[in-house]
Amino acid sequence: MKIYEGSILTCDSQDRVCRYLVEDGSRIVYVGDELPAKFASGSRVKLGDRALIPAFGDSHIHFASFATFHAGLNVSDAKSNAEILEMIRSFVPTCADKMVIAFGASPHSVAERKFVTRQELDGVCPDKPLFMIKYDGHTCVVNTKLLDILKEKVQHLRGYHGDTGEMNQEAFFAFSDYVSSSVPPVKLIRNMQLAADHLASKGIGMIHSVSGVGYTMDLDVDMENWFARGLGNGLQMRVYFQTMDVQKAKRRRLPRIGGCFDAALDGCFGSADAALLQPYEAPTTLASCITPTSRWPNSAKRPTGSVCRLRSMPLAMPLSIRPHGR
């Protein structure tokens, strides 16, 4: 039993700040301003100038993807493309995987105000496939080694830019699916454990994982579901199946469905392909729905008693639908 004494921010309906919180066996058993005698024997932690707050919840995370990226190279702190390229150059010799994965690139936070190109990536990583995903998770840049693997499959898809190596829309999803499925299941489970510990260390206590990112037979959905049941660090995990095929979720007895990818309605602002009625970056940025509108309303109505989430990027939040057979 442990007693925390100090500023306890409850975030309850009255927004109370209490003096004591008692934790026993990873459960909160008391919160208040006076410490009951039955808890007096517990060990005390005086917070001093610190405060104790409830854990954060992440309502939309692609956990398998996050676990994969977390195990790779994070370039989000780079201030220039030159710095990104140097980070990759230093990382490649230490990477034992068959593919180099980098995450967090943004043209908005580097001095050049543009993405690195395929040719620049080739200069620092010519011998291994390299997949660098944008901070928004909906655009990537690939080097020639990776492009050559999928070129025949993706060159006619919307969003394909073979000259620069930048992939958007359906071309991006094709590369993302390939990269996801290239990670061995055993390695993915290990990466998931490291990712869960990392989230917990940052104060995140609950995640809604939207799953289904390209694994054969949607193996990542099953692995996340099994992984969630075995978590021992207190992290709560709710799995949403990213699909418009309700039967896939029902066969796995999953009560939740929706997210991005197969359930995405449109693109996102970060990649300037969100579907709006008026242009917002260039005369051609009206974009369009990725999923035909004829599909998603019926899918949302079908699973009576389930929770559906369809992702509309401009809203920056999920549309939570709780059908009741109407």
Regions found by a protein language model. Give the residues of each.
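Short amphipathic
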Residues: 3, 256-261
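Divalent metal-binding segments
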Residues: 2-4, 9, 13-24, 28-233, ...
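Active-site and channel-lining beta-strand-loop segments
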Residues: 20-21, 261-263
